[in-house]
Swiss-Prot record:
InterPro entries linked: Aur-like, Kinase-like_dom_sf, Prot_kinase_dom, Protein_kinase_ATP_BS, Ser/Thr_kinase_AS
Protein name, as recorded: Aurora kinase A
Organism whose genome encodes this protein: Rattus norvegicus (Rat)
BP term (GO), one: protein localization to centrosome
Ways its activity is controlled: Activation of CDK1, appears to be an upstream event of AURKA activation. Phosphatase inhibitor-2 (PPP1R2) and TPX2 act also as activators. Inactivated by the G2 checkpoint. Inhibited by GADD45A and p53/TP53, and through dephosphorylation by protein phosphatase type 1 (PP1). MLN8054 is also a potent and selective inhibitor. Activated during the early phase of cilia disassembly in the presence of FBXL7 and CIMAP3. Inhibited by the small molecule inhibitor VX-680.
Record's compositionally biased regions (Basic and acidic residues): 103-118, 388-397
Phosphothreonine found at: 280-281
Length: 397
């Protein structure tokens, strides 16, 4: 259970970063691979503990000049570190991993090696490349495993900063959950290790960056792209929910794009296993929070369905449906489910979004119903997989 101080219900703090829409922050976030850059002049997006200012990548070394930390962070819980990675010969250069059969072979090779060899990773096993992202707790770098030449993303987090923010448990949860998930639309966590001052997460590299950055670049998406992304996300969430995992922080900043433009869910820091199917902690981005969470009521996996509706709206319109200049106004709009559609949003899209943004969570469409919705079927270029995604991705596990 998250600590009380993680709750979003606190006074807003003005952002001073000159990039992107002004964001009201409560605390900071572990960095993702690709920080989004946004245009100015937009209303504030109210953020909760899982968010931070997206600072443009800065070239710096991840290991130099760091003083030892007296207080040690206990080793992260979860699976043992993954073994030495392996991939096809073509991955010798720092480029996106191949898709299709080559990608399946890479994943199969990795898993076989994981099963046959168990070892402790160290920083010496990797060649460190350019920075991909920078955040409050550390940085993300493009990296290459020396022996196999496998290209990946290495998230480097500083223990002293994790301790000061009191988010060790959040990191442990992210490692525990994400390392066990196998789906083509979920970013893979291969393993982790740590030294005296840092924690390292070995992640799949998503070369096309965040959906947030792409959305800011294009202002909004067309119906075909939106429906395709919603299909991929619904497939991934269906898989997560079948594993009793609730993400709780679905938003453009936490969605990455693979080499073929496929969507990948990342940042599972606010996700939870759901043995009781209920969690009451308020977390994530306020714009994407459902009424039951901001009102402090019990909630289940249906919170992700609400976020799916908000996401679909933002993809088509270019801004979240409940966005306002103040925390209080955003809160009020969500509680009353007050939003309107621009004239250019089609009837099919309006129907889907309206049936997801229901105050009563039991009245929201299920993920299966989302995948079978006429607007999705008419516009998406990807087929639904739902719970069958496990079978479809067995080769990559």
């Amino acid at each position: 259970m998250d600590r009380c101080k993680e709750n979003c219900v606190s006074r807003p703090v003005k952002s001073t970063v000159p990039f992107g829409p002004k964001r009201v922050l409560v605390t900071e976030q572990i960095p993702s691979q690709h920080p989004g850059s946004a245009s100015s002049g937009q209303a504030q997006r109210v953020l909760c503990p899982s968010n931070s200012q997206r600072v443009p990548p800065q070239a710096q070394k991840p290991v130099a000049g760091q003083k030892p930390v007296l207080k040690q962070l206990p080793a992260a819980s979860g699976p043992r570190p993954a073994s030495r990675l392996s991939n096809p010969q073509k991955s010798e250069q720092p480029q996106p991993a191949a898709s299709g059969n080559n990608s399946e072979k890479e994943q199969t090779s990795i898993q076989k090696t994981e099963d046959s060899k168990k070892r402790q990773w160290t920083l010496e096993d990797f060649d460190i490349g350019r920075p991909l992202g920078k955040g409050k707790f550390g940085n993300v770098y493009l990296a290459r495993e020396k022996q196999s030449k496998f290209i990946l993303a290495l998230k480097v987090l500083f223990k002293v900063q994790l301790e000061k923010a009191g988010v060790e448990h959040q990191l442990r949860r992210e490692v525990e959950i994400q390392s066990h998930l196998r789906h083509p639309n979920i970013l893979r966590l291969y393993g982790y290790f740590h030294d005296a001052t840092r924690v390292y997460l070995i992640l799949e590299y998503a070369p096309l960056g965040t959906v947030y950055r792409e959305l800011q670049k294009l202002s909004k998406f067309d119906e075909q792209r939106t429906a395709t992304y919603i299909t991929e996300l619904a497939n991934a969430l269906s898989y997560c929910h079948s594993k009793r995992v609730i993400h709780r922080d679905i938003k453009p900043e936490n969605l990455l794009l693979g080499s073929n433009g496929e969507l990948k869910i990342a940042d599972f820091g606010w996700s939870v296993h759901a043995p009781s199917s209920r969690r009451t902690t308020l977390c994530g981005t306020l714009d994407y929070q459902p009424p039951e969470m901001i009102e402090g009521r019990m909630h289940d996996e249906k919170v992700d369905l609400w976020s799916l509706g908000v996401l679909c709206y933002e993809f088509l319109v270019g801004m979240p449906p409940f966005e306002a200049h103040t925390y209080q106004e955003t809160y009020r709009r969500i509680s009353r489910v007050e939003f309107t559609f621009p004239d250019f949003v089609t009837e099919g899209a309006r129907d889907l979004i309206s049936r997801l943004l229901k105050h009563n969570s039991s009245q929201r469409l299920t993920l299966a119903e989302v995948l079978e919705h006429p607007w999705i079927k008419a516009n998406s270029s990807k087929p639904p997989t739902g719970h069958n995604s496990k079978e479809a991705t067995s080769k990559s596990s």
